[in-house]
A protein has these predicted regions:
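A short, aromatic-enriched beta-strand patch in the conserved N-lobe beta-sheet
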Residues: 197-198
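Conserved short submotifs of the Hanks-type protein kinase catalytic core
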Residues: 202-216, 220
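Regulatory alphaC helix of protein kinase catalytic domains
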Residues: 177-182
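Conserved activation segment of eukaryotic-like protein kinases, specifically the C-terminal portion
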Residues: 295-309
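Conserved catalytic-loop aspartate of Hanks-type protein kinases
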Residues: 321
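Protein kinase glycine-rich loop
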Residues: 138-149
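Activation segment signature within eukaryotic-like protein kinase domains
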Residues: 237-238
């Protein structure tokens, strides 16, 4: 040590162990740590005593938010000598890290243990991998086959926290979840619900999105049964949802689960730029679950929004999304179910009706031109259905005449 230009400091009075710094920062003053990959820092430990000391670093307990390893794991230091230790950290989420790291020495001659501490003090870059401690869960606002949705707060914003059911025990579901998160992270569209991020830590897995004050279009239909939402607002919400579908389709993505339940209403103010937003896209796992049970007897779902070609187990294409949007338009303008239980007692009756090429007739509360547009969306032949941008044009012309 006496030939080194490294400045050593005492860890505590009378301790034979010296160190070059008490805080391990990974150069955090200049660079935020990347999430999901390792960053290295170096710390020097010296033996200022006469006896040989075995030195190692240990953390008190396993941490959910980062992985830590030290190289070399153990060194025998003779008196007057020092050694470099490499500290590697891999953050698993966006977080600030302040953690005590024990420096444990064992005097071989005297059989005495020396315990000192240094501090890891660093911060990561901002990512969509969320620190669960930043989420404040307030109250339950919904539940489905996927899990439970809570209202919460994340960095001062009202958010929806979707906690997944038993996902950590299902490897396929976890892979599907990660794929969906990867896709959501890339979306930049005003008409798709804003994605803040997700928690990947086992037993805390959840997705965090923008909170929609009015819930889904489906929620509004149930709650506002006796309050008629103006035709203008119905058209506007559907235009917004169609713009979300257009964004997905132009990027080669299929929604696969378009229905009033997956259109969220953020505002019913007619002057708002955006009133409705799409959510729950790419839910191929929902489709797969339904396809394995085409008789619809186990309560997994109904074929209400499924195009005839999907019921016949053909490949899913953009036109199947258009069909689903046609049924969604029917229910929105009618402000009720397309296939009420009174007329369709069993889910297979709906599938049978659709496969025969039959469709619901125009109810009195759907104007003729709008019903004509709906029929162009739910045509039996996929190639006869309108592309989404043509639907937007027609809806916008209806809006102008309101």
């Amino acid at each position: 040590m006496k030939y080194s230009n490294i400045q050593f400091i005492e860890l505590s009075p009378n301790s034979p162990l010296l160190i070059n710094k008490k805080n391990i920062t990974f150069d955090c003053e200049n660079v935020f740590l990347p999430v999901g990959s390792e960053t290295k820092d170096i710390i020097c430990v010296g033996n200022n005593g006469k006896n040989e000391i075995k030195v190692q670093f240990t953390s008190k307990e396993q941490n959910d938010k980062f992985l830590l390893r030290v190289q070399p794991p153990l060194v025998a230091l003779e008196g007057g000598y020092a050694c470099e230790f490499e500290i590697f950290i891999q953050p698993l989420c966006t977080c600030k890290i302040e953690e005590k790291l024990s420096v444990i020495g064992f005097d071989m001659k005297e059989g005495k243990e020396i315990i000192e501490t240094v501090t890891i003090k660093t911060e990561t870059e901002m990512t969509t991998k969320i620190d669960p401690d930043e989420l404040v869960q307030e109250k339950k606002i919904g539940e489905g086959t996927f899990g439970i949705v809570y209202l919460g707060i994340f960095r001062g914003n009202k958010v929806a926290i979707k906690r997944m059911k038993d996902i950590q025990d299902d490897e396929d579901a976890l892979i599907e979840f990660e794929k969906e998160i990867f896709m959501l992270d890339k979306f930049r569209c005003d008409y798709i619900i804003h994605f803040y991020g997700a928690v990947f830590i086992p037993n805390k897995i959840c997705m965090v999105t923008e909170y929609a004050e009015f819930g889904s279009l489906q929620d509004m239909m149930k709650k506002e049964k006796n309050i008629q939402i103006r035709l203008f607002m119905k058209i506007k919400i559907l235009i917004d949802a169609a713009k979300g579908i257009s964004y997905l389709h132009s990027n080669g993505i299929l929604h696969r689960d378009i229905k009033p339940d997956n259109i969220l209403v953020l505002s019913i103010d007619e002057s708002s730029k955006v009133n409705g937003k799409l959510t729950d896209f790419g839910s191929s796992r929902n489709i797969n679950m339904m396809m394995t049970n085409m008789t619809f007897t186990k309560g997994i779902g109904t074929p209400t929004y499924m195009a005839p070609e999907i019921l016949q187990q053909q490949k899913y294409k953009k036109t199947a999304d258009i069909y689903s949007f046609g049924i969604t338009m029917y229910e929105t303008f009618h402000w009720g179910e397309c296939y009420p239980k009174l007329l369709f007692k069993f889910p297979w009756a709906i599938a049978d009706f659709i496969n025969k090429g039959q469709r619901r007739e125009r109810p009195d509360n759907i104007p003729e031109p709008i019903y004509k547009l709906i029929t162009l969306c739910w045509a039996q032949e996929p190639k006869e259905r309108l592309p989404i941008d043509s639907i937007i044009e027609k809806l916008e012309s209806f809006l102008q005449s309101c």
